[in-house]
A protein has these predicted regions:
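A short beta-strand-turn-helix
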Residues: 110-131, 165-175
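Conserved redox-active cysteine motifs that mediate thiol-disulfide chemistry
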Residues: 135-167, 191-192
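Sec-dependent signal peptide recognition
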Residues: 2-10
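Hydrophobic h-region of N-terminal signal peptides that target proteins for export
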Residues: 9-18
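Extracellular calcium-associated, cysteine-rich motifs in secreted modular proteins
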Residues: 17-101
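Thiol-/selenol-based redox modules, centered on thioredoxin-like
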Residues: 229-266
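Loop/turn elements at helix/coil->beta-strand transitions in domains of secreted/extracellular proteins
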Residues: 23, 126-132, 176-183, 208-213, ...
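Short, internal strand/loop/helix patches
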Residues: 181-185, 193, 197-231
Length: 266
């Protein structure tokens, strides 16, 4: 009987902490913590309804701008120079640099979204969901076609690519059903100038999807961290912001996992 009371107690506590009186996606506990009105849906932390992570300080990724030496993106000559013991040349033969690898924590980016708000990317963590990071540019045609598909569901422009698989259609459904978190980070506009709020605002206007967070890599911090050699460059993170995949170009590994063609690595 005591066990039953304990179970009921924990259920009541859990329900108390998950109450969302105004239905804005933020629990009353979070709203009281951040100072928004738990009974007013229009008074919320993020206009875009992005998650809020009360425990984001526990994510120990590198702060931006990245400080050298030793951190990922810094120059190196041997593995021991790097905090992650991974000194590599880029696919273009540049470097070597301390290079990201699976298990590394994505850096602590705070950037402007399509609604003009600064979003802390660590707020996406600890939500029990996979986080998809698409890195690209506004001039990148495949990036445009992927965002068009995510907006409309039309895959016709993607079916001409050799890397496209019909199983990838499931990814859009997972995004729209809030099963995964999808982030598009743009580092350049159509004129190949540094991205800013106008860049991501225009992107969202062209390819609207309220479930896709679009961020501007205004100072190229993520560009220098990833050192991509092709676009889009898509990787996935676990809920602790650790890389599940890492590539400097392409999307196949990430999309194969997201569409259940491959299992999540142990």
């Amino acid at each position: 009987m005591q066990n039953i009371y304990k179970i009921l107690f924990f259920i009541i506590i859990a329900l108390t902490f998950s109450v969302d009186s105004d239905g804005d996606g933020y629990s009353d506990k979070i709203e009281r913590k951040v100072g928004t009105d738990p009974n007013n849906k229009s008074d919320r932390y993020y206009y875009g309804f992005w998650p809020f992570n009360l425990n984001k300080d526990k994510i120990r990724g590198a702060e931006i701008p990245i400080e050298c030496p030793s951190n990922i993106s810094c120059e190196c000559s041997q593995n021991s120079d790097c905090i992650n013991n991974n000194c590599q040349k880029t696919l273009r033969g540049e470097g070597p640099y301390c290079t990201p690898k699976v298990g590394d924590i994505f850096p602590h980016l705070i950037a402007t979204d399509q609604y003009g708000e600064y979003v802390d990317i660590y707020d996406l963590g600890m939500q029990g969901k996979t986080i998809v990071i698409e890195f690209g540019a506004a001039w990148c045609n495949p990036c445009k076609q992927i965002s068009s598909w995510l907006s409309t569901g039309d895959v016709s422009s993607l079916q001409n690519y050799s890397w496209w698989k019909e199983e990838y259609r499931a990814i859009r459904d997972k995004i729209n059903h809030d099963e995964i978190i999808f982030v598009t980070i743009l580092f350049q506009n159509e004129s190949r100038e540094n991205a800013n709020h106008e860049t991501v605002f225009n992107w969202h206007e062209k390819y609207p999807n309220e479930n896709v967070l679009v961020l501007a890599d205004e100072y190229r911090d993520i560009y220098f961290w990833l050192k991509p050699s092709g676009y889009p460059c898509i990787n996935i993170l676990d809920e602790n912001m650790k890389l599940i995949t890492f590539t400097g170009r392409g999307l196949s590994d990430a999309f194969d996992i997201l569409s259940d063609l491959k299992p999540y690595p142990n």
